[in-house]
Swiss-Prot record:
Protein name: D-aminoacyl-tRNA deacylase
UniProt keywords, alphabetically: Cytoplasm, Hydrolase, RNA-binding, tRNA-binding
Family: Belongs to the DTD family.
Species name: Clostridium botulinum (strain 657 / Type Ba4)
Subunit field text: Homodimer.
Source lineage: Bacteria, Bacillati, Bacillota, Clostridia, Eubacteriales
């Protein structure tokens, strides 16, 4: 399971011109799910994301987590995080989990976050979305539950 975690001032997702999710200060998470992912990957990434100390304290040090600041989180499914561009010029998405199986793991991930964070918004799994991200910093962290980078 992979995530691009961005510290944001605000973020929102639109589908067919309608805002379906929005947040204020917090994290925008683009989430990719692979064919090998399990509930253990969900647990690992959830704990890592909500406890990442990427928010500034009173001394402007990155010492506070999303939980510490009571921030919001928006989670957007993005299978393209498993795009393999090592051969040719067109990405291969063969490692990405698709369809119903990916939707189930995505929803389990969202539910696990909702148990910890007050304001959780999402995109629409499988939809063509417009994602608006107002970065803060910018601070962008790449995470992989298989620790490949």
């Amino acid at each position: 399971m992979r995530a691009v975690v961005q510290r944001v001032i605000s973020s929102k997702v639109e589908v067919d011109g309608k805002v379906i999710g929005s947040i204020g200060k917090g994290l925008n998470v683009l989430l990719g799910i692979s064919k090998e992912d399990t509930e253990e990957d969900i647990k690992y990434l959830k704990e890592k994301i909500i406890n990442l100390r990427i928010f500034e304290d009173e001394n402007e040090k990155l010492n506070k987590s999303l939980l510490d600041i009571g921030g919001d989180i928006i989670i957007v499914s993005q299978f393209t995080l498993y795009g393999d561009c090592r051969k040719g010029r067109r990405p291969s998405f063969i490692e990405a989990l698709g369809g119903e199986e990916a939707s189930i793991l995505y929803n389990k991930f969202v539910e696990s976050i909702k148990k910890e964070v007050n304001n959780v918004a999402t995109g629409e799994f499988g939809a063509d979305m417009k994602v608006y991200i107002e970065n803060d910093g910018p601070v962008t962290i790449l995470l992989d539950s298989r620790k490949t980078f």
